[in-house]
Amino acid sequence: MMSFSLLSIVSIALAATVSATSDGTNAYTAYPSVAKTASINGFADKIYDQLPECAKECVKQSTSNTPCPYWDTGCLCVMPQFGGAIGDCVAKNCKGKEVDSVESLATSICSSAGVGEPYWMIPSSVSDALAKAANAASATTSVETATKSAAAELATTSDTTIVASTSHESKVAETSVAQQTASTEKSSAAETSRAKETSKAEESSKAEETSVAQSSSSANVASVSAETANAGNMPVIAIGGVIAAFAALI
């Protein structure tokens, strides 16, 4: 009777095993296979090459403070002490999009290992520190952008001022040159007019001198003629006087 009971139990167990294998309800087949080795650890290996440089040293955390095998990705993802150490390091060394990249990769690797939400389990204080690191970089970027924009506007204004000043100086210089040219032309015209007046005066003076000389010459000629005429009359008068004297004596 007892042997029959043992045989029945073994048969039932074998039937259950065959049934479970044939219908595919083995719970372990629902999870991905896990490599039981890692060069760094089960968390870091698959994402290391995609991490920003600031986070690569952070994921090289020791797994000795966890009950997990160092190669077990899923186990490491749910250990706050392990994930928290990585998160603190990232918050101190990375900023902005670098932080976002690390969190995205961590979520992806933990989700792939079969871990449910929130996938990468870290303390809330570490989560806050990561958020501040990301936001601080965004604020810094905004300030830098505003500073660069202001500098660009200042440079543009300065260039405009320089151009305007140069244009003004150029116009002033052109005006000055034009004024000097006009003044020179006026001076030349005045000198030309003076030269003409001087020439006319000299010509008039020469004409007057010539006229005076001609008048003087005419007068001299007339005087000489008169003297010559008088000289011609003198013998006649003298002869007449002699004749009169003789007549008186007789």
From Swiss-Prot:
Propeptide: 231-250
PROSITE patterns: CFEM
Pfam family, one: CFEM
Binding site for heme: D72
Molecular function via GO: heme binding; metal ion binding
Principal location class: secreted
Compositionally skewed regions (Low complexity) per UniProt: 178-192, 210-219
An example Gene Ontology biological process: intracellular iron ion homeostasis
Lipidated residue numbers (GPI-anchor amidated asparagine): N230
InterPro entries: Extracellular_membr_CFEM_dom (IPR008427)
Membrane topology: Lipid-anchor; GPI-anchor
Annotated signal sequence range: 1-20
Disulfide topology: C54-C94, C58-C89, C68-C75, C77-C110
Note on domains (UniProt): The CFEM domain is involved in heme-binding and contains 8 cysteines and is found in proteins from several pathogenic fungi, including both human and plant pathogens. The CFEM domain adopts a novel helical-basket fold that consists of six alpha-helices, and is uniquely stabilized by four disulfide bonds formed by its 8 signature cysteines.
Its biological purpose: Heme-binding protein involved in heme-iron utilization. The ability to acquire iron from host tissues is a major virulence factor of pathogenic microorganisms. Involved in biofilm formation.
Protein name: GPI-anchored hemophore PGA10
UniProt gene name: PGA10
